Curated annotation (Swiss-Prot):
InterPro entries: Adenosylhomocyst_ase-like_sf, Adenosylhomocysteinase-like, Ado_hCys_hydrolase_NAD-bd, NAD(P)-bd_dom_sf, S-Ado-L-homoCys_hydrolase_CS
SMART domains: AdoHcyase (SM00996), AdoHcyase_NAD (SM00997)
The name this protein goes by in its record: Adenosylhomocysteinase
Cofactor(s) demanded: NAD(+)
Any single Gene Ontology cellular-component annotation: cytosol
Binding site for substrate: T56, D131, E190, K220, D224
Length: 464
């Protein structure tokens, strides 16, 4: 498989991709600063990074930063709908192996995950950069299978295809994924769902290499998850449906950082926003922000637009969808497609209006509009978060890769956070672009509150 240098939609799109990448670089000061800081040191020289993260223009800037810092990279998207084909083409044109096409089948998706581990010449990856945990799960389950542990019964079509692909790799190159797992110095994980998977694996004692939780860096979760969703959610809904948000009733399921950004996004568009929550603290936050907190059973017949962002499963059920209004819009901005019971609609009549926009007709004649087949709407129906906020997230990713690759002996087979001083560094790198002038503590002031003059300024437990 390593013989194919790339799989993209159309390599001739590379020129268009390069133009957008050039513009994005101007909006991604953190990554560009790291290129300058580490230009001579090349701290990732010798790193072979298997990357599974949405293949967008912004990710192209991340990939080229990793390469500038000395790494070799093989890349796939972490979602079947999120690739921007011109971005993938631009990366392929730079002779960086990339396997990503917008609108992949599930078979293609898992084949591409397999390919990013296939370095050829007997080599393996020694680092993983992950978003959602699929690449990590691929190598961990491969090693389990090679150790004689059997898969549990698959619960859905995707699990069947995942298991089939891992089995194929194990049969083709016995011992390869065990060898890969032993070579991995660490994984940096981008998103809430992937981090949850890592903590579950670590709790069972089954994590085979160290991991850094990038998602819970303040400059990721409080910016990408919040401000990113605040801009990208309504962009996706409008591009997909041309709906006017003003005056509509929208329901946001979940009021974590993504839910907070999503609710603000819809409110800023003029919608009246309902919120559903299971956590009393988040529910109280939503209520005190002025949102009406209800159950989904109460929201189903009232709302015009539904957005899930819980990271959980079966949030919007078939019964909820049956109770919805004619032409209610249903979408998800959580990482996986488990939040909406899309499989329960399999026997309904589906009419594709345009890519990633489907009209689903119930037996009684009522129709709802499903976006991106329940997968990430902001990347399926639009282009995701703006470059600037992704610069903060991806600067964390690069720092995590450097930390794990260069300081491997500091880490056990567990999940870690980036230290506070690096979190503050990421923020500081983005201030000049916004014209921010930081105040500076005097030594007396620093002593008074018990912090160094140049930080870190907050304890690890501080809630921003």
């Amino acid at each position: 498989m390593a013989n194919e240098p790339y799989i993209v939609r159309d390599i001739s799109l590379a020129g268009w991709g390069r133009k957008e990448i050039d513009i994005a670089e101007g909006e991604m000061p953190g990554l560009m600063a790291l290129r300058e800081e580490y230009a001579a040191k090349k701290p990732l020289k010798g790193a072979r990074i298997t990357g599974s993260l949405h293949m967008t223009i912004q990710t192209a800037v991340l990939i080229e930063t990793l390469v500038d810092l000395g790494a070799e990279v093989r890349w796939a998207s972490c979602n079947i709908f999120s690739t921007q084909d011109h971005a993938a083409a631009a990366i392929a044109e730079q002779n960086i192996p990339v396997f990503a096409v917008k609108g992949e089948s599930l078979e293609e998706y898992w084949d591409y995950v397999d390919r990013i581990f296939d370095w050829g010449k007997g080599e393996t990856a020694n680092m993983i950069l992950d978003d959602g945990g699929d690449a990590t799960m691929f190598v961990l389950w491969g090693a389990k299978l090679e150790a004689g542990v059997e898969f549990p019964a698959p619960q859905n079509e995707e699990e069947e295809i995942f298991q089939k692909t891992v089995r194929r790799r194990v049969a083709a190159t016995p011992g390869f994924l065990t060898k890969t797992a032993k070579a991995i110095k660490g994984v940096s994980e981008e998103t809430t769902t992937g981090v949850h998977r890592l903590y579950e694996i670590a709790k069972k004692g089954e994590l085979l290499f160290p991991a850094i939780n990038v998602n819970d860096s303040v400059t990721k979760s409080k910016f990408d998850n919040l401000y990113g969703c605040k801009e990208s959610l309504v962009d996706a809904i409008r591009r997909a449906t041309d709906v006017m948000l003003a005056g509509k009733v929208a329901c946001v399921a979940g009021f974590g950082d993504v839910g907070k950004g999503s609710a603000a996004s819809l409110r800023n568009g003029g919608a009246r926003v309902l919120v559903t929550e299971v956590d009393p603290i988040c529910a109280l936050q939503a209520a005190m922000e002025g949102y009406e907190v209800v159950t989904l059973e109460e929201a189903a017949p009232r709302a015009d637009i539904f957005v899930t962002c819980t990271g959980n499963a079966d949030i919007i059920t078939l019964d909820h969808m049956r109770a919805m209004k004619q032409h209610a819009i249903v979408c998800n901005i959580g990482h996986f497609d488990s939040e909406i019971q899309i499989n329960s609609l399999a026997n309904m009549k589906w009419t594709e209006i345009k890519p990633q926009v489907d009209l689903v007709k119930f037996p009684d004649g009522k129709e709802i509009i499903v976006l991106a087949k329940g997968r990430l709407v902001n990347l399926g129906c639009a282009t995701g978060h703006p470059s600037f906020v992704m610069s903060a997230s991806f600067t964390n990713q690069v720092l995590a890769q450097i930390e794990l690759f260069c300081n491997t002996d500091k880490y056990q087979k567990d999940v870690y956070m980036l230290p506070k001083h690096l979190d503050e560094k990421v923020a500081a790198l983005h201030l000049p672009k916004l014209g921010v002038h930081l105040s500076k503590l005097t030594q007396k002031q620093a002593d008074y509150i018990g912090v160094p003059v140049n930080g870190p300024f907050k304890p690890d437990h501080y809630r921003y």
